[in-house]
């Protein structure tokens, strides 16, 4: 079962490009020009594999009278929900949360109680005390164009982020590539204390979009916390669209839209972690970055963000996902 293609460009104009964009684009071009055809194919493969098919045994679940799935459950997770709540009903196409709660606030409260119970029973681990908002796809895409998922009132509900994979919900995150003028890239190595992908290479800064945050404020926060960058520098990051990744993971279904930003780092500035989530930063050549991706030393999401940024530097890029070729022009 395929849930389709999500590979779109952000709304920034090339008719009046900023100086920051010109310099950034030149840096990314240098990165790409340094790659061999084989190395470019490694990046292509990242995007080809970004969206995995939903497992055949996955159980879709629906919110109220929704026609499209809200999320995807592992079979054992579906059984747990049916054992805990009477308003989760079995239907031929999956489960339906036939909740009497009709407002985002009341749904959120009901789900908060359910998520806490699942955590107490050991079905949800790594509790973060951070909430993500859930928007149906139709809210994110307006007339075919991506919009910032920042309007809390437009969300169907909000929930503890640790429970998102259990329920197979689509989350959002901001990822920032740190390029230098000579086409090198700053990459962080995740702390060994991280619950997910400890010790692996990552983008310079990245983090989930929490309730009430804008994409820009999320990026500025993450660049300060993870890389020690000033707000003034962080605000110069250039948006470059989004790429969605989804795959089966031990805790459930990972489904996340990654909002890509590129930042041109000053030559005399090295990122310095502030929150303990990054063990070290390394300035890597294009070849070293691609080698890390090929050898699975970089997280899947970070690799997709790098591939998205680099392969789109030349304007028109063909990417095959789930058997279909997508063409997008900057």
Predicted segment positions?
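Acidic, Ala/Val/Gly-enriched low-complexity intrinsically disordered segments
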Residues: 1, 9-11
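N-terminal leader/linker segments that precede catalytic domains of diphosphate-processing enzymes
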Residues: 11-12, 16-200, 208-224, 229-272, ...
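Short aromatic/basic micro-patch
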Residues: 283
